[in-house]
Amino acid sequence: MIKTLVIGSKGFIGSHLFKSLSAQGEFEVWGSDVVYDYTSHNYFVIDASNSDFEEIFEGNQFEFCINCSGSASVPDSLIHPLRDFYLNTVNVFKLLEAIRKYSPKCKFLNISSAAVYGNPVVMLITENAALRPLSPYGQHKLQAENICMEFHMFHQLKTCSVRIFSAYGRDLKKQVFWDIAQKSIKSKKMTLFGTGEESRDFIHVDDIVYGIECILKKGEYDGAVYNLANSIEVTIADAAAELLNSLGWQGKLTFTGQLRKGDPLKWRADITRLKALGYEQKISISEGLKDYVKWLKEEKLV
């Protein structure tokens, strides 16, 4: 059994990854997060604002540690930059320092973000594109990537970072699709930020998990970075229309014409490196949004 630790195992990506790895049979999966879990023996409770990972690694030898923890809000990072820095950067350093001391053979996979790119000059966005974050969140994710490289270069730890683009899917109660769904309940008139022509490279959480597993098993751990997306550019207007159609909403959608601070204009990833590891998209944006609406209705959230 491959002993694997998922940090942030109760979060959006972490919880789906934990379930998938646990179901495969070859992994002995342990979790760690800020909430208590009285039903699981393979679980560590941590205080994210004052984390101490040394006790975890002092008593356990893991083959893999996957860091899915941290804050994932651009607006919140602008309001509370120190908190965001601690959750997204300092905790990565503390994790790697604990691994360096007690479990130096452990491979560390860090979940990063496409926010490190900001507004790219060239589309497609390769992993070698210029890194110009537009927010503290993006800057802190980039600093965490640099820390992963630091521990590889100077302490010979095996690390890599995964830059996830626009994630969505069941259990996500924030960001654009959640906001649209909640607004659809309240009114037949809806206003969204931007012009609608802004674009994203959306990826369903099931495909995110599949991509992480491809990197986990076949990726390089020399401080490498991987884009995790589908290399399909979808405008916000088209994505919103698809979701509202699945919701059965009939009303008037308008856009403010103004971007929120920290939001990029257009994203489309080059996923050549990821596809070389065997990744192929399984869930289209249309299928994924229908599944998201099904979940919203099952949970009586719309």
Regions found by a protein language model. Name each.
Residues T4-Q24:
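N-terminal Rossmann NAD(P)H-binding glycine-rich loop of SDR-like oxidoreductase domains
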Residues N50-L87:
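NAD(P)H-binding glycine-rich loop region in Rossmannoid oxidoreductase-like domains
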Residues C65, F93-L134:
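Conserved Rossmann-fold NAD(P)-dependent oxidoreductase catalytic core, especially the SDR/UDP-sugar
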Residues V74, N110-L124, P136-L142, A167-K174:
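Conserved catalytic-site region of short-chain dehydrogenase/reductase
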Residues S113, E145-R170:
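Conserved beta-loop-beta element that borders a ligand/cofactor-binding pocket
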Residues L142, L157-K158, A167-D179, K188-K189, ...:
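Glycine/proline-rich active-site loop of Rossmann-fold NAD(P)-dependent oxidoreductases
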Residues T195, G223-Y226, V234-A241, G248-K266, ...:
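C-terminal "lid/loop" region of Rossmann-like NAD(P)-dependent oxidoreductases
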Residues I285-V302:
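Amphipathic terminal alpha-helices
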